[in-house]
């Protein structure tokens, strides 16, 4: 399933998505990820985190490590993958996001769009079952947005389970099975993209769409 979470700033979108791998702690209710309940049990948290990849608004790459080292760090330390195997996997995913030639460079030598594609490749190196994207294009120059969205569309077409917080409504229309609209910490409306965009039920959703699609 590919879910897009939309809503105005401060509506709780990023907090919701960060709860799914315990970067934020939920106060009530249950979060169950692939059959494992996210509780205060550290074993459960580690298990879920190892299966949930996350790509942030700001790329969060280690500036003192090469692109290849950024991609192999977690598999080597967390999954205990042999270095050679980790490097082969990293090159596979760097090719997938179309920047294998950048492997030996440092993050500061890459454009924002390239760094975000590295961040996606780095997450994929852990072979996650679910990918979380927290406004992955909002810090990018307009001409770099397409290259990141193209990578995400390709992932979606290959069947990756994805939750994506984004204002890119064209991406939501093209890729999502379901669009969730949040406001003031609540899910106001959720529906299939066609129904969500063409026939929104809530007045708050209608206002949001008129503002974001009117530009």
Which positions does each model-derived feature cover?
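C-terminal boundary and immediately downstream tail of ABC-type ATPase nucleotide-binding domains
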Residues: 190, 194-215
């Amino acid at each position: 399933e590919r879910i897009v979470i939309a809503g105005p700033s401060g509506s709780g979108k990023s907090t919701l998505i960060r709860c799914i791998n315990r970067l934020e702690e939920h106060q009530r209710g249950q979060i169950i990820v692939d059959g494992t309940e996210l509780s205060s049990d550290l074993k459960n948290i580690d298990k879920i985190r190892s299966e949930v990849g996350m790509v942030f608004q700001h790329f969060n790459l280690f500036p003192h490590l090469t692109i290849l080292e950024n991609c192999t760090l977690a598999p080597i330390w967390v999954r205990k993958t042999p270095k050679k195997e980790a490097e082969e996997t990293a090159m596979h995913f760097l090719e997938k996001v179309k920047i294998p030639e950048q492997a030996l460079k440092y993050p500061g030598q890459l454009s924002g769009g390239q760094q975000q594609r590295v961040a996606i490749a780095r997450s994929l190196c852990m072979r996650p079952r679910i990918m979380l994207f927290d406004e992955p294009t909002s810090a990018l120059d307009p001409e770099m947005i397409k290259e990141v969205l193209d990578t995400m569309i390709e992932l979606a077409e290959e069947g990756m389970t994805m939750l994506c917080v984004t204002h890119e409504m064209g991406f939501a229309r093209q890729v999502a099975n379901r669009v969730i609209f949040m406001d003031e910490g609540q899910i106001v409306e959720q529906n299939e993209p066609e129904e969500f965009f063409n026939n929104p039920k809530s007045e708050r959703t209608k206002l949001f769409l008129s503002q974001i699609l009117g530009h």
